[in-house]
Amino acid sequence: MAPPSIFAEVPQAQPVLVFKLTADFREDPDPRKVNLGVGAYRTDDSQPWVLPVVRKVEQRIANDSSINHEYLPILGLAEFRTCASRLALGDDSPALQEKRVGGVQCLGGTGALRIGAEFLARWYNGTNNKDTPVYVSSPTWENHNGVFIAAGFKDIRSYHYWDAAKRGLDLQGFLNDLEKAPEFSIFVLHACAHNPTGTDPTPEQWKQIASVMKRRFLFPFFDSAYQGFASGSLEKDAWAIRYFVSEGFELFCAQSFSKNFGLYNERVGNLTVVAKEPDSILRVLSQMEKIVRITWSNPPAQGARIVARTLSDPELFNEWTGNVKTMADRILTMRSELRARLEALKTPGTWNHITEQIGMFSFTGLNPKQVEYLINEKHIYLLPSGRINMCGLTTKNLEYVATSIHEAVTKIQ
């Protein structure tokens, strides 16, 4: 008798919620269906959008006979790393001028977070330090917890961020948690367009946050997934990162180019490292090279080439910023329109938070039962947390979504 499969006892894992939601949406035959869960930009026709500047650069790359398919260096395409870090920090960054910045090309924002987490688990404060507390916001993007756990960190904690009652930032709770955190703890910070709440600190609030972190020697690890995409301004969306650098912080910044270039399946990311001295950067990158070597060995080239060529050419750069603003402006319009319709319907509660939030997502305040009603009765797909992707709204479905939310809030408590 043959022995049972060595895989017989492997348990079935739960599906990734946001991807399961999209699969359910696709299988739904109802013509009214709306997908507000997908984490990607959509046009007013509910279609993916390839940025015109990306099409142009892809064509140029295809026609460039000097390009081959040799391995990139382990740390990635040099021009991409330089351009990406400069985008985050600004051309006039003192850290760049003093050559104490390094970049590592990674597989999207998740890859940048993972390489940063793996490095910190091995070398933070010069030692293997997996007992260091890592703080993530409550709520946060679900991958933040998983990435740091997978890197070996044993103490993942949450810090206050969202005030459900006022549907805004719990600044005092945030500051209190910073004060109570052990010195040298790691804090994962959303650079802009906080996921899932869409609520960001103001510059003055960021200054308060930085002041406590500086005094208590807390390490900032920024996640920058939406630069330019949140407000339409590259500078505004990078304000917090640049302020922390100006205050003398050493920090990591995981950058994603999925949203602001529409390069979701190219997995284009960069980990920007800011240190106090140039020598530190050389040593840090030498260790990150070892980590990358055993993780994916060498990164893919196509997406990095597209981003590098666009960011390094003034004409293409200007076209790209225009494309990004087109996306950001459509999201802002959908926010205004949804709020206006809910208020016109006199939907119970307050809805000003929809326009006060920023970026792709809105934390609506809908409870899980109301979400269940919207999915089952109205075929409107969103996450149980009540988070919606504003890009899923269009001029064609806005009225239906607003009246459905009104119905859910009115009927279901």
From Swiss-Prot:
KW Amino-acid biosynthesis (keyword) present: yes
The alphabetized UniProt keywords are: Amino-acid biosynthesis, Aminotransferase, Cytoplasm, Pyridoxal phosphate, Transferase
Top-level taxon: Eukaryota
List the CDD domains: AAT_like
Q: Which InterPro entries match?
A: Aminotransferase_I/II_large, Asp_trans, NHTrfase_class1_PyrdxlP-BS, PyrdxlP-dep_Trfase, PyrdxlP-dep_Trfase_major, PyrdxlP-dep_Trfase_small
Record-given protein name = Aspartate aminotransferase, cytoplasmic
Q: What class of enzyme is it?
A: transferase
Instruction: Please give the Gene3D superfamilies that the UniProt record associates with this protein.
Output: Aspartate Aminotransferase, domain 1, Type I PLP-dependent aspartate aminotransferase-like (Major domain)
**Gene giving rise to this polypeptide:** GOT1
Q: Which organism is it from?
A: Bos taurus (Bovine)
